[in-house]
Amino acid sequence: MLELPIISISIFLPLISVLYILLFISQSKKADKAIYVMYVAVLSSVLTFISTIYILIEFDSSNPAYQFIERYAWLDKIGLEFHVGVDGISIFFVALTSFLTLICIIGSLFTVKKYIKEYLVCFLLMESFCIGAFTSVNLLLFYLFFEAILVPMYIIIGVWGGENRIYAALKFFLYTFFGSVFFLLSLIYIYSKIHNFDLTYIPELTGNIPLFTQQILWWAIFIAFAVKIPIIPFHTWLPDAHVQAPTSGSVILAGILLKFGGYGFLRVLLPLFSSVSQEFAIYVIYLSVIAIIYASLVALAQKDMKKMIAYSSIAHMGYVTIGIFSFTEAGVSGAIFQMLSHGVISSCLFLIVGTLYERLHTKEIAKYGGVASKMPVLATFFMIAMLGSVGLPGTSGFIGEFLSLLGIYKVNVIATFIAALGIILGAVYMLKLYKEVMLGEITNKEIMHFRDLYKYEIISIAPLILLIIYFGLMPSSILNVFRLSVESLLVKF
């Protein structure tokens, strides 16, 4: 049986679609070019999603090594190969990328009013680059995809964002690019000593690098991924980016891009510098605890819905980093689960805020109230997403936070109790948000004319709601897939 290069298909199908749109549809003289662009974008995202689901179905969870490996020579002089594969850690992020991209593209067909062709092209490019980064086994290839993601996201915020979109886009780009410079310099040094970028090979050799140099490299790479998560004090770009980004941009930003921080720690930092990671872990843990409490308190004071959810993301990603740097199976498994759960819950919340914004054209909490009486379906969806965000048992949010706290409890009891306070604060600000937006009397007359969710909005939000419940009730179906990969990662710890 001929084996398909299924990962290459997942990476390059969106790129080929972009080329087709730009080279053929754009040159067409037909008046309905935009319709053809929409068809191509939807078909491409559907096929890419199917290909990633095929990978997920065929994946052998009893094998912790990379699977579906493809390896082709490229630029041997600098150690660059097209070397891709998936393991238990990366496979769900690949599926999440294609799933959220499909949701964003479908929703965009009904909400984007200008430059729809360019908008869809940006999302297809981002899908390709994200899948490429999550599947890269060559460290330099990972860096190239990791950096390429910046460009379409910058354009999405800068062109289709809100009133202060240029400022937010520049801030996003400069922060992320700043961190990536340190990453690039580290790669150059590593290659000068090891002459290899194979992620299955170089972890065995980085121990030969002098300890002080390892420490410098560790901090350089840590900063690159800390900006992505983001960890305080590298977080200030995120609230601005979320507030100004269009709804679909916020979905991709929260659902996928923030995950590269935690994924980078798991894929690059811990394997390459295991001993130094143990040495500096306590600092990361306390930074994460500070981030959880600080972001939760700031979220509590917000008057803008998207900014509140943005700060809640910083708090939730804090549980990811404490789980990772606990170096326990429970903690790391919880961190991966938390990233997946947050990707689903935060995406759902941003879509819900987007539906409200489409009707009232404001994200200010005080302008709402009593929406549930006019939009009961949305109110139900919002309730489930909100309960997932606060970590109610039976939802996906509970599993990740519980395992992360269980992992860190074995290492640092004080940090565990402080981090647990973040869960209480999270419940306070999310319940407050729901109460002020959905419940009470209708004080804004425009809300009287609201109609409940349109079909395309239900199609976008309902699958995420189902995943929040499924992940919460059947967590073992997710945890078992990456259990052996986590055990393999933690051998050095």
Curated annotation (Swiss-Prot):
It is found in: Cell membrane. InterPro entries: NADH_Q_OxRdtase_chainM/4 (IPR010227), NADH_UbQ_OxRdtase (IPR003918), ND/Mrp_TM (IPR001750). Pfam families: Proton_antipo_M. It is a multi-pass membrane protein. GO terms for biological process: ATP synthesis coupled electron transport; electron transport coupled proton transport. GO terms for cellular component: plasma membrane. It comes from the Bacteria. Its EC number is 7.1.1.-. It is an enzyme of class 7 (translocase). This is NADH-quinone oxidoreductase subunit M. NDH-1 shuttles electrons from NADH, via FMN and iron-sulfur (Fe-S) centers, to quinones in the respiratory chain. Couples the redox reaction to proton translocation (for every two electrons transferred, four hydrogen ions are translocated across the cytoplasmic membrane), and thus conserves the redox energy in a proton gradient. The chain crosses the membrane at residues 5-25, 37-57, 89-109, 115-135, 139-159, 172-192, 216-236, 251-271, 280-300, 308-328, 334-354, 375-395, 411-431, 458-478. Belongs to the complex I subunit 4 family. The lineage of its organism: Bacteria, Pseudomonadati, Pseudomonadota, Alphaproteobacteria, Rickettsiales. Its main location: membrane. Keywords: Cell membrane, Membrane, NAD, Quinone, Translocase, Transmembrane, Transmembrane helix. It comes from Rickettsia felis (strain ATCC VR-1525 / URRWXCal2) (Rickettsia azadi). One of its GO terms (molecular function) is ubiquinone binding. It catalyses: a quinone + NADH + 5 H(+)(in) = a quinol + NAD(+) + 4 H(+)(out).
